[in-house]
Amino acid sequence: MAQEEGGSLPEVRARVRAAHGIPDLAQKLHFYDRWAPDYDQDVATLLYRAPRLAVDCLTQALPGPPHSALILDVACGTGLVAAELRAPGFLQLHGVDGSPGMLEQAQAPGLYQRLSLCTLGQEPLPSPEGTFDAVLIVGALSDGQVPCNAIPELHVTKPGGLVCLTTRTNSSNLQYKEALEATLDRLEQAGMWEGLVAWPVDRLWTAGSWLPPSWRWYPASLPRMASSPALSTCTESGRRPRLRK
């Protein structure tokens, strides 16, 4: 399935729709495994800019130097967000994804210090509460992807840390977007988060018609929640990441 150039725009759009439309989780992850070798080329065909916009948002909001911040990239896929994070100087990067094939692609450039196999919404994130200075979910908050009820799992963010989320506002995702906004509102009303700003952007796919807003959220004070087993602290920069199950 690998190819040197991405598919045509109609082919790539069809592939994205197919991925979102698979209801069975195992089949969906298998689809992503098979798609992984071509994924970067395909989203380049769509002129996909969500990773860059999310990192721009994070860079402007995060206090302190980027190189000292420990970042978690949830649903990291092939590592498009990591590539954008390295440009402004973020070096301590962890990633999780449910697709082994995607993680294999993400591991190859050596940008992540740790990669873990984890499907958010099906299992806890593999880090203890209050670990990360910032957590991002880019491109996975839509119908058929990460469920809204998984958002409280982001308590792996440190109190005072940042969470940066992107979603879409096209007609096929409006129901999910409304549910996501309701979830974020409930968390804010419960005192778990403080909303900083929502960035409406023209398009995340400049070759398509998906019109998402970008979100930033600030965990003000987090109540105790059931934490997943702790992993060891991050490895030294430049070491090969370890893929964990």
UniProtKB/Swiss-Prot annotation:
Swiss-Prot/TrEMBL keywords: Williams-Beuren syndrome
Source taxon at top rank: Eukaryota
Illness association: METTL27 is located in the Williams-Beuren syndrome (WBS) critical region. WBS results from a hemizygous deletion of several genes on chromosome 7q11.23, thought to arise as a consequence of unequal crossing over between highly homologous low-copy repeat sequences flanking the deleted region. Haploinsufficiency of METTL27 may be the cause of certain cardiovascular and musculo-skeletal abnormalities observed in the disease.
Name this polypeptide is given: Methyltransferase-like protein 27
Gene field: METTL27
